[in-house]
Regions:
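Nucleotide-binding motor/catalytic cores of P-loop/tubulin-like NTPases across gene-expression machines
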Residues: 79, 85-124
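Beta-strand/loop-dominated core regions that host nucleotide or nucleotide-derived cofactor-binding catalytic loops
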Residues: 110-113, 126-131, 158-167
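Long, charged amphipathic helices and adjacent flexible linkers at domain junctions
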Residues: 19-55
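Short, ordered loop/turn segments at secondary-structure junctions
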Residues: 5-9, 39, 72-76, 93-98, ...
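Short beta-alpha connecting loops at secondary-structure transitions
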Residues: 1-9, 37-41, 84-88, 110-116
Length: 167
């Protein structure tokens, strides 16, 4: 959705932007907008892309999943995820403010500060789920699809995907 100069700087700019936001949100609720054929006929270019798009496919086809938790350094994986239409939130969890700022522009992505490097690999899944429950994003009994890299703290190394119950 794009504004022309006349509507963007007219007498009622706030009302115009509000009406356009309502129209965009309404369009995204249409069933056609919730399914995607993005890259359906092409091969993946990297393991990271395979995980990102497979996670979206899995989450969209498993009704108990209430969102995706993506542990990220640079934000590449949640950016790839946002290219697929979905009614599910993509929680981009990062310890880097610059990454979170960039991800704020991606459709369906909720950027959240989370210093996952502060946790041991054994505690990471439980702490991530706990963080999202405490933030009011998830409830007990939900499922969350989580992506991360097996080598914690390295950018561009997303290679794990898990579906976790929220206990």
């Amino acid at each position: 959705v794009m504004l022309s100069a006349e509507t963007a700087v007219g007498a009622f700019p706030v009302e115009v932007v509000s009406a356009m936001a309502d129209a965009a949100l309404g369009a995204e609720q249409h069933p056609v907008a919730r399914t995607s054929r993005y890259r359906a006929d092409r091969e993946f270019s990297s393991p990271q892309e395979a995980i990102a798009l497979s996670a979206m496919y899995g989450a969209n086809h498993f009704p108990e999943v209430r969102g995706l938790a993506c542990l990220t350094e640079r934000g590449t994986t949640p950016t790839m995820m946002s290219r697929l239409s979905s009614g599910l939130p993509i929680f981009a969890l990062s310890r880097r403010p610059d990454t979170l700022q960039r991800l704020a522009l991606c459709r369906g992505v909720i950027p959240l500060f989370f210093d996952f490097a502060a946790f041991s690999p054994e505690d990471l899944e439980a702490r991530t789920v706990e963080f999202l429950v405490d933030g009011g994003f998830l409830s007990r009994g939900d499922f969350i699809l989580m992506t991360m890299g097996s080598t914690q703290g390295e950018a561009g190394k997303t290679d794990l995907m898990k579906i976790l119950p929220v206990k």
